[in-house]
């Protein structure tokens, strides 16, 4: 329906939009040096299941019949940002942390993943946050590498993003993404805070102050 609305709007004079269905880690169909501005909001590594957010629409359209169908239809294609996206039996944490994409932040990510792996032992759910964090930043590093290829020089990228603290362990998402962008070939980054998070509700799971805003990357 949204697609057809966009097609209809193209009959009006003005700039035209092209809708591509592609993986941000590959950007198939986008020419090299195509863009000089990218504005997007990637998944936040805060254990929100973006696949589950599509369940109502996909059920209505007949694309899924039960909750388990989301794994085959959606989850396996997502950047891991939820513990349900990573299976302890199928992810080799050591191999992920050793991947070349993580070299700019390997020590910091390894330390955080180690703390998460230790904390989960004392938690009932034993959620695989340590695997989620490692896989998330490896995949986001791949996104930055592809963005560098499809962006002109100079260009500007804006990520609306927020940090995270699974099990109360702080994950500095903004500087880590910024460092990955620099490693991919961009020149500089800055952050513009929009709001504070995890400060409103008294029944929140942890007391770590979080923020959300715009990560600006130039180069």
Task: Name every feature range the model reports, one short phrase each.
Residues 45-146:
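SAM-dependent methyltransferase catalytic-core segment centered on the flexible catalytic loop
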Residues 1-40, 45-52, 107, 111-114, ...:
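SAM-dependent nucleic-acid methyltransferase catalytic core
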């Amino acid at each position: 329906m949204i697609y057809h609305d966009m097609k209809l709007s193209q009959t009006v004079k003005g700039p035209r939009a092209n809708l591509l269905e592609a993986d941000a880690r590959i950007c198939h169909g986008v020419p090299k040096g195509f863009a000089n501005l990218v504005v997007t909001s990637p998944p936040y590594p805060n254990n929100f299941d973006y696949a589950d957010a599509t369940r109502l629409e996909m059920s209505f359209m007949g694309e899924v019949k039960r909750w388990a169908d989301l794994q085959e239809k959606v989850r396996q294609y997502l950047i891991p940002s939820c513990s349900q996206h990573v299976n302890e039996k199928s992810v080799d944490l050591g191999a992920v942390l050793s991947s070349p994409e993580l070299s700019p932040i390997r020590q910091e990510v390894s330390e955080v993943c180690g703390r998460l792996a230790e904390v989960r032992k004392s938690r009932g759910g034993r959620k695989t946050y340590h695997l989620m964090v490692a896989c998330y930043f490896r995949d986001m590093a791949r996104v930055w590498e592809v963005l560098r290829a499809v962006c002109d020089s100079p260009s500007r990228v804006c990520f609306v993003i927020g940090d995270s603290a699974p099990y109360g362990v702080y994950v500095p998402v903004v500087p880590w993404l910024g460092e990955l962008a620099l490693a991919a070939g961009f020149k500089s980054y800055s952050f513009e805070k929009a709001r504070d998070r995890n400060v409103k509700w008294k029944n929140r799971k942890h007391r770590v102050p979080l923020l959300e805003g715009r990560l600006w990357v130039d180069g």
